[in-house]
């Protein structure tokens, strides 16, 4: 986590000395200065794009959307870090067609068609016990919206969806890597 950025960077250095690769799984809410140093040490990053409205980021996360978008653009265009994005879809909170269309259009325009995007299912735990789990159909709808926007590698997660979890050739649509839960 970025809150332990120095520790993560030291750990990344130690991993690299042993020939190991490093992956940062982060909310991406970083000041540009530390982000430069942090992502220079990482081989890959999975950034949580929690929603595509500033209102959600402010009310639910206590932050703002723009710094996360800035981090995504920075990692995609200014580093050698492999980038993937994950959005946890929470029913009624960040899963409207409009928001998903805006998210997909932004990713296509700012990051390009080849940055993988994962839509994960929410499960009611901890503080959001009053919200139902994300239906598989919602994830499939989000995936279709993103693919229709031109994104080539869009996945569903936290549900059993063999097609949505597999990698398909963007040219012919055939499965290249078939995943079934944790089986490849």
Task: Describe the predicted segments one by one.
Residues 93-184:
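Auxiliary Fe-S-binding modules of radical SAM enzymes
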């Amino acid at each position: 986590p970025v809150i332990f950025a120095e520790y993560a960077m030291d750990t990344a250095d130690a991993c690299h000395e042993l020939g190991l690769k490093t992956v940062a799984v982060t909310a991406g809410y970083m000041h540009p200065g530390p982000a430069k140093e942090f992502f220079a040490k990482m081989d890959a990053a999975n950034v949580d794009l929690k929603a595509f409205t500033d209102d959600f980021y402010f009310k639910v996360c206590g932050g703002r959307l723009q710094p996360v978008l800035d981090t995504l653009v920075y990692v995609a265009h200014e580093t050698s870090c492999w980038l993937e994005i994950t959005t946890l879809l929470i029913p009624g909170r960040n899963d409207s067609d409009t928001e998903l269309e805006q998210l997909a259009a932004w990713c296509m325009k700012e990051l390009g068609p080849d940055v993988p995007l994962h839509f994960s299912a929410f499960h009611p735990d901890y503080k959001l016990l009053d919200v139902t789990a994300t239906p598989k159909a919602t994830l499939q709808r989000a995936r279709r919206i993103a693919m229709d926007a031109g994104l080539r590698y869009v996945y569903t997660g936290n549900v059993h969806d063999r097609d949505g979890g597999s990698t398909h050739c963007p040219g012919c649509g055939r499965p290249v890597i078939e995943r079934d839960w944790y089986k490849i």
